[in-house]
Amino acid sequence: MKRRYSILIILLVAIFYRMITFRFKYLLGYDPYFHLAYIEEVNKVGKWINFLTFAGGPWGYQVKLFHPLGLWMTPLYLYKLLKVFGVSLTTTFKITPVIFGVLTVIFLYLSLLKLYDEKRAFFGGFFLAISYGHVFRSMANYYRGDNYMLFWYSVALLGISLALGIKKGKWKYKRLIFYTLPVLASGFSAIFWQAYYPIFAFLLSNALLLAVGAFILKKDKYLLDSIILILSTAFGVLLANYLGGIFGYGMLGYAKWLGKSVAKKLGLEFGYLKDVYLILHLKYLVPISLSFVLVLILLGFLTKDIRIRSLFLGIASFIGIIILFKRFEALKELSTGFGIFKEAPILETQPTSFKDLWAAFSLSFFLTPLFFIRFKKPRVEDFLTLGLIIPSVYMLKTWTRFLFIGSMAIAIMSGIGIVELYEAIKPRLNGKKALATGIITLVILPGVIAGLSFKEVCSLHPEMNEAWERALKWLKNNSNENDVILAWWDWGHFITYYARRSPIAQGGPSVGVALYLLGKLNENWAINLGVDYVIVSYYDFLKFGAILSTANLSKRYNIRGYGLVVLPLRASTGALIFENRGYRAIVRHDKSWNAVIIYNGQMIYPRKLYVEHKEGVQEIKPPESNSNTYLYVNLNYGYAIFMNGNAFNTTLVRLFITPEKPYKLVYSDGGLIKIFKLEHPNVKVERRESNVILNFENGTSLGLYFFLDNGTMVLSKWYNVKGKNEFIVPKVNASVARYVLKRGKKVVDRGVFRLSYN
């Protein structure tokens, strides 16, 4: 196949797979809604802002403590280029992941072309183009930062391949200039994603394995490439540190709690370098790696015997690892994010299961061992590739989050492996058998993998829907700009985007919210956080297991004995039949409502039956009951919820079915989403002419805290407001203000609002 056709096929396939999800009206997942909300706000005011008042309730949210600005700059500046063609900001945001995902595929193809040959480059690029493991974080409508990290690594790999691909001629040493690409790529990756560090680990591993290959294969001239690649990561660290001062540092930066915590664990101090990993890399990993290569160079002069070289190599590697972990024992916790993700019930930080691997890579995962056929007659390029494979495999087994980052290694191994298999078999066959083998191996098998990946991509659907959009837009139009919202954390970014209101939980599990929904914390806890509205939904019941797991992180409460199952409607002829997970609820309405639940052959009659229809929720006491269970039936949307007494008595269920004061139902769509106003002395921000006025009732003291947009507090003061119902906010040179309203010593409301964009 001609090269131009190969790259065209890979390009079209990569675009096609990643644009499948563009058909959706809504974004996929949760985090993209926060990113788009921030970008829209920046575009509206015409400048970069740090302190957000519609996130992180009730305190507000500082973007500088999240990702570097490059994550949001890219789609915004791309939009400024595309808007002349009529492309909207939302559309630009949706397709930005596709652009960088496709570029990653193309750069991988070009890299493999220089390192190997056309066939291996084509299949390596093709497998990455169709890999669901790569597609699902580089597809339209799903915007995530790790897409940029892998893109920049592909740029770095291209630079390495260009440097290694020139064997002789006048470019023999000038070729080393291509190692500036790893410098730039690793440095620039720091401004696009807060967890960009794997690119440095990959490049360092590439360098070390390149040295190992050169040493074992007696290709000692490549040891120079290894040294230069190691040094390129050092210059990349300096560039990343410099850019961090402009665009913001990564998650291990000096101003972030994780950076401070890990620095303390590792015994590191911030100085010129403002990031824990950058310090660790430059001060320890680079010197140890250089020492390792220099030892290999010295040994190369002493012996040419491969067995002796291999022995010394093993000893040197073992000593290097011992030194590193002896100096930094806390590195043993690296795979758990230094302990912060050991128990958190987040799907992305769970160990990878076979089911996850199958969904991400299907049959291509089983082709990966074929890559090692090359090691019958290895080349230094194979060892360089191992430098990506080894850390990728470690990451793959650690977290499902790393399926994407490991997808490039899987694509390379399976793509090259399938060619190795074919070329190993082909000489033993001739005629039609050789042709049939070629068709099966190089056409049908990749086609099956492509089909399985296509099925996975097509199975995706947004968590956001019209019910959420209607509810949150209603909330935006019927609440105050400073109102604080309580909902399960998965919906927090939805609230930020559609309602432009501040949720108290978003982007990560909240133990407090979980305990509140289970009734372990009451409304006084919520009022102390300034909560004005509480959202409960049908979707919360689908997350009930996660709510229990999150609440279990608290050591104060015993979270046991909760039983709840959601039962979809399966049949409606004669009787309503709801069924799921072995439970079957049969509900009839003759002269009155009655219900029975069948489980393991046992007939269970609930203590109470609740039926919601267009007129509202109807409570029915069945004529007979033999259990402390409850059944809620929703006729509007065709589902039922069967629960035991513990689950029924949670705040989540009580609000959804039988709300009481101080909660007032203000919005309901009949069974999907319900919004309650938590009635308490509430502060309302009002703007009259040039004044900002706080309206309230039943308060005795008001605390105001004024901040610059960069998060610096410039003034804090308490005011006596007893007998007053409004307060004119003093004019202070500040951008954001937090408020706390007290009645006596009790906090009755709090929140945050913007003063200006200065």
UniProtKB/Swiss-Prot annotation:
Belongs to the STT3 family. The keyword DNA damage does not apply. Pfam families: STT3-PglB_core (PF21436). It catalyses: an archaeal dolichyl phosphooligosaccharide + [protein]-L-asparagine = an archaeal dolichyl phosphate + a glycoprotein with the oligosaccharide chain attached by N-beta-D-glycosyl linkage to a protein L-asparagine. Despite low primary sequence conservation between eukaryotic catalytic subunits and bacterial and archaeal single subunit OSTs (ssOST), structural comparison revealed several common motifs at spatially equivalent positions, like the DXD motif 1 on the external loop 1 and the DXD motif 2 on the external loop 2 involved in binding of the metal ion cofactor and the carboxamide group of the acceptor asparagine, the conserved Glu residue of the TIXE/SVSE motif on the external loop 5 involved in catalysis, as well as the WWDYG and the DK/MI motifs in the globular domain that define the binding pocket for the +2 Ser/Thr of the acceptor sequon. A motif (TIXE motif) lies at residues 340-343. A motif (DK motif) lies at residues 540-547. Mn(2+) binds at D31, R144, D146. GO terms for molecular function: metal ion binding; oligosaccharyl transferase activity. The lineage of its organism: Archaea, Methanobacteriati, Methanobacteriota, Thermococci, Thermococcales. Keywords: Cell membrane, Glycosyltransferase, Magnesium, Manganese, Membrane, Metal-binding, Transferase, Transmembrane, Transmembrane helix. The record marks R137 as: Important for catalytic activity. It is found in: Cell membrane. This is Dolichyl-phosphooligosaccharide-protein glycotransferase 2. GO terms for cellular component: plasma membrane. A motif (DXD motif 1) lies at residues 29-31. Oligosaccharyl transferase (OST) that catalyzes the initial transfer of a defined glycan (ManNAcXyl(2)GlcAMan(2)GalNAc in Pyrococcus) from the lipid carrier dolichol-monophosphate to an asparagine residue within an Asn-X-Ser/Thr consensus motif in nascent polypeptide chains, the first step in protein N-glycosylation. Its cofactor is Mn(2+); Mg(2+).
